[in-house]
Every structure is written in structure tokens, then in C-alpha cells.
């Protein structure tokens, strides 16, 4: 059985990913986080979890740096723009969590893979796994 904290963080990562996708189409961090967090709740007047806001605002603040780090791990001839928005945002979220949080690296990688399975396909999940695993290996 999954612990409540892990389940909660997993759900917040999902909300963070949804907020990041929303930000691709023009909104602000708080609005994107609020919608992602409350869209399926009856009570929408809630305080947003700090973990959610920290993830989304952190990825947004370091977007260019994260993209450079991701690009360094792409195959020759590939650019960040060639990736789908889903893959880009999952990789940004994964790299940000690996480099900026105390989350164990393997947990951050696994969570990104699970999100890829939910929002994309197995091919994308394998790609996310490969790139983030390479990133973790080279960072050690």
C-alpha cells in the first residue's frame, strides 16, 4: 500500500505537470496551480500546497537552465524543440526535482516515468526513463 505522503506527493506532481502544461499556453503560476489542484474538488477555496507551488515556480524560474541540461543529454541532432510538450515538461519537472529537492533521485525518475505513462505512451515513458537515468548517472 502506498503511504499517504507518497500518494499526496504523487498527486501534487501530477498537478504540477498539469500546471506546467497550462503555463505553455499563457497564464500565471498561481492560476495554473490553483486550477490544476482544484479542478476536480468541490471546495476550490483552499490553500495551495507549498510543494506544488515550489515545483511549478521552480521549473518556471529555471526553465532555460533545465532545457540546457536536458539538451546535453539528447542524442546528436536532437533539440529540445523536437520533443513533445509532454516530454519537455516531464523532463523539466524530473530534472528540477532531482537537482533542487531532497527527493531521492530514483524516486524522482520513477515519478516522471509514471506521469509519462499517464499522459503519454510507453515509448515516451521509456525515453523519459533513459534520459533521466543518464542524467542521474552523469551527475553522480
UniProtKB/Swiss-Prot annotation:
Disulfide bonds: none annotated. GO terms for biological process: DNA-templated transcription termination; transcription antitermination. Keywords: RNA-binding, Transcription, Transcription antitermination, Transcription regulation. GO terms for cellular component: cytosol. GO terms for molecular function: RNA binding. It comes from the Bacteria. InterPro entries: NusB-like_sf (IPR035926), NusB_fam (IPR011605), NusB_RsmB_TIM44 (IPR006027). The keyword Transcription regulation applies. PANTHER family: ANTITERMINATION NUSB DOMAIN-CONTAINING PROTEIN, N UTILIZATION SUBSTANCE PROTEIN B-RELATED. Belongs to the NusB family. Involved in transcription antitermination. Required for transcription of ribosomal RNA (rRNA) genes. Binds specifically to the boxA antiterminator sequence of the ribosomal RNA (rrn) operons. This is Transcription antitermination protein NusB. It comes from Streptococcus pneumoniae (strain 70585).
Amino acid at each position: 500500500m502506498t503511504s499517504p505522503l507518497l500518494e499526496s506527493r504523487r498527486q501534487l506532481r501530477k498537478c504540477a505537470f498539469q500546471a506546467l502544461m497550462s503555463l505553455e499556453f499563457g497564464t500565471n503560476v498561481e492560476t495554473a496551480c490553483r486550477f490544476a489542484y482544484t479542478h476536480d474538488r468541490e471546495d476550490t477555496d483552499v490553500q495551495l500546497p507549498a510543494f506544488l507551488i515550489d515545483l511549478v515556480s521552480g521549473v518556471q524560474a529555471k526553465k532555460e537552465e533545465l532545457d540546457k541540461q536536458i539538451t546535453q543529454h539528447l542524442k546528436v541532432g536532437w533539440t529540445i524543440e523536437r520533443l513533445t510538450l509532454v516530454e519537455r515538461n516531464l523532463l523539466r519537472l524530473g530534472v528540477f526535482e532531482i537537482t533542487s529537492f531532497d527527493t531521492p533521485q530514483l524516486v524522482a525518475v520513477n515519478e516522471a516515468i509514471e506521469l509519462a505513462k499517464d499522459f503519454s505512451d510507453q515509448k515516451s515513458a521509456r525515453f523519459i526513463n533513459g534520459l533521466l537515468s543518464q542524467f542521474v548517472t552523469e551527475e553522480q
